[in-house]
Structure formats: C-alpha cells, structure tokens
From Swiss-Prot:
PROSITE patterns: MRAY_1, MRAY_2. It comes from Mesorhizobium japonicum (strain LMG 29417 / CECT 9101 / MAFF 303099) (Mesorhizobium loti (strain MAFF 303099)). This is Phospho-N-acetylmuramoyl-pentapeptide-transferase. The lineage of its organism: Bacteria, Pseudomonadati, Pseudomonadota, Alphaproteobacteria, Hyphomicrobiales. Catalyzes the initial step of the lipid cycle reactions in the biosynthesis of the cell wall peptidoglycan: transfers peptidoglycan precursor phospho-MurNAc-pentapeptide from UDP-MurNAc-pentapeptide onto the lipid carrier undecaprenyl phosphate, yielding undecaprenyl-pyrophosphoryl-MurNAc-pentapeptide, known as lipid I. Belongs to the glycosyltransferase 4 family. MraY subfamily. It is a multi-pass membrane protein.
Length: 360
C-alpha cells in the first residue's frame, strides 16, 4: 500500500504524508490493533474449541494458577496476524531489514506454535525438544545475521559500541554472526520465560518496541545519527513502522489477556516477539542497549540459568521458584502486584536505555 499511495503524492499533495515514517508508524499501530480487536474473539473461540483443556498448568506452580486451567493458548497467532498484516500495508517493503525482521518473527513464531501444539496435545508443560528448538532458532538467527551483514543496501559495520563509553568500540569481524545469533536467540527465550502471568510479558514487549522504534527511527536518519554519534544504518527507519505494529497488536492482545485472561500468548507469541526485538537490536547496532531496555527479560532468563546451574552443582535452589516472577508469588505477592511492579521496572529500564543515546 505504501508504494501505491506514494505514487499519488506527485499528483495529490495530501498523499505526501505517506512518505513520513512517523505517520505510517501511527497507521501501522492503529491497523494492527484493529486487526486483533476484530478477529481476536473468533480466534479465541476457535482455539478454545480445538484445544479442549487448553494450556496445561504446572503442578509445582503457585496455587492461584490452577483456576486458569482450560484457558486456550497460542494467542500469539492474534499478535502475529496484526503485526504482519499491518507491516505489509504500511512499511516500505524495499527495505531488506523489514523482511529480515518479519521472517525471523515468523520463524520463531512457527517454532513456538509447534511447541504450544505439543504441550496442548500431550497436556504437559514439556513441549518441543530443547536442543532441537534451540538448533532451529540458531539457524534462523544465523540466516538473519548473514543477510544483515551482506544485504548490500548500506555499508556494513561489524563494530560493537557500548553505552556511556563512545570511545570503547570492539570490531567483531566475522564473530558478528555468532554474536548476533546469541542476541536474537537469547532475546527470544528471555521473553518466552517472562510470559508466565496474565499481562506480564506483553506490556514490557510494547515498552521495548516503543524504545527500539525510537532507536530505529534515529539510526535510519543520517542527521540524527550524526548528532547523537550512533551508527547510521540506512533503511532501519522502516523498522519503526513494524514496531508500531507490535505496539498496536500488543494493545489488542492485552484487551483479551488482561486478568482473568481469555487467552494466553503461548510460545507462539513470546518467542516471536523476543526474536523480533533481538533482530531489530542487531540491525540498528544497539545490541548492548537491548540489555538495558530489555533488562526485565534479562533478569528473568538469568534467574532460570542460576537456578538450574546452582541446583545441578549443590542440589539446592537459590529461588523458591524460577523464573523469578514465580519466586515473588511464592513470597506472597499477588499476581497483580508482581505484574504491575515488573511493568514499572520495565518503564524505568527503557528510559535509562533511551538516555544512553545522548549520554555517550
């Protein structure tokens, strides 16, 4: 639609607004939200009929979770429909970065869908083989990293910059590809582990999307990039449109995921969203900033790594339960307290992350 409407700009001046990324980002946000609002109830009813018992609830989880039994999962299908449909309408599809991000999103979403399918059919929280799942994720991430490195649309830089230290730069060289794989796969699984309470993951996802929407817009603009002394990556500005679609789809999904949730995001959505944000961070050359903006996700995945590692070494646990949001539930926090307090942390971390654009 972007190309069609811009063609009219030479004849009808009002169509010039479609040249502006900011306008199209707003359009993508509204469109994706409407897609989820309109088709959401149909998708939820269909999934409820097909899944029967819905997503299985962990037997060792907090007692308050057992009342959620029967809630359908795979709500990520709603989110992906909104993002992809809206992005194809509003984004400039001549940007290779748009295609890379959307394909990673679809790839990770497909892996998550199969994982959800196995969990529902087997009625077990153990789905897809961990090794096979990670292997597929690394293959998809590796292809994305290779395309970003050899896309030919702009001079490529393999340098890694650090917030608050503009003079400290590491040239990754060919290590850029394995490093990017680590970022993308790590982001996907970090968001996946965060998705354990109603509304817990989707709001921080939208916050991260908004933050990286700003970063993508600035990175794709030569004037702003030079002023802020950040990497100028032509074409990444269009990722702001995709991220606008993420926010819109997230708002639509939250309408149905607000407690008591009518549907869960599932791995279909959480893996896809994490992979999307991780790929944007790699494309815009802000991988380290992702650690700050997505700090909540980082803490969640670290809590699992620490819990598993320490238990294997000592037979004891560091946390009452991992990921860490369940630890706080076990301490007596209500679900709403955990969710809202984690949202607040996500907002603070996003503001800190954005501040690094100027404080260099």
């Amino acid at each position: 639609m972007f190309t069609l409407l811009v063609d009219f700009a030479d004849k009808i001046s009002v169509f010039n607004v479609f040249r502006y990324i900011t306008f199209r980002t707003g359009g993508a946000l509204i469109t994706s939200a409407l897609i989820v609002f309109i088709f959401g109830p149909t998708i939820i009813n269909s999934l409820r009929l097909r899944q029967g018992k819905g997503q299985p609830i962990r037997a060792d989880g907090p007692q308050t979770h057992f009342k959620k039994a029967g809630t359908p999962t795979m709500g990520g299908l709603m989110i992906l429909s909104g993002i992809i449909g809206s992005s194809l309408l509003w984004a400039n599809l001549s940007s290779i970065y748009v295609w890379v991000v959307l394909l990673v999103t679809l790839g990770f979403g497909s892996i998550g869908f199969y994982d959800d399918y196995l969990k529902v059919t087997k009625q077990s929280h153990l789905g897809f083989s961990g090794k096979a799942r990670l292997g597929l994720e690394f293959i998809i991430a590796g292809i994305a990293a290779w395309v970003i490195m050899h896309n030919g649309q702009a001079p490529f830089s393999s340098s890694l910059t650090f917030p608050f230290a503009k003079e400290f730069i590491i040239n990754l060289g060919w290590f850029f590809i394995p490093f990017s794989c680590f970022v993308i796969v790590g982001a996907g699984n970090a968001v996946n582990l965060t998705d354990g309470l109603d509304g817990l993951a989707i709001v921080p996802i939208m916050i991260a999307a908004a933050s990286f929407g700003v970063i993508a817009y600035l990175s794709g603009n030569a004037v702003f990039a030079e002023y802020l002394q950040i990497h100028f990556v032509p074409g990444t500005g269009e990722l702001a449109v995709v991220l606008g679609a993420v926010i819109g789809a997230g708002l639509g999904f939250l309408w149905f995921n607000a407690p008591p949730a009518a549907i869960f995001m599932g791995d279909t959505g959480s893996l896809a969203m994490g992979g999307l944000i991780g790929t944007v961070a790699v494309a815009t050359k802000h991988e380290i900033v992702l650690v700050i903006v997505g700090g909540l996700f980082v803490v969640e995945i670290l809590s699992v790594i620490i819990q598993v590692g320490y238990f294997k070494m000592t037979g004891k646990r560091v946390f009452l339960m991992a990921p860490i949001h369940h630890h706080f539930e076990k301490l007596g926090w209500t679900e709403s307290q955990v969710v809202i307090r984690f949202w607040i942390i996500a907002v603070i971390l996003a503001l800190v992350g954005l501040s690094t654009l100027k404080l260099r």
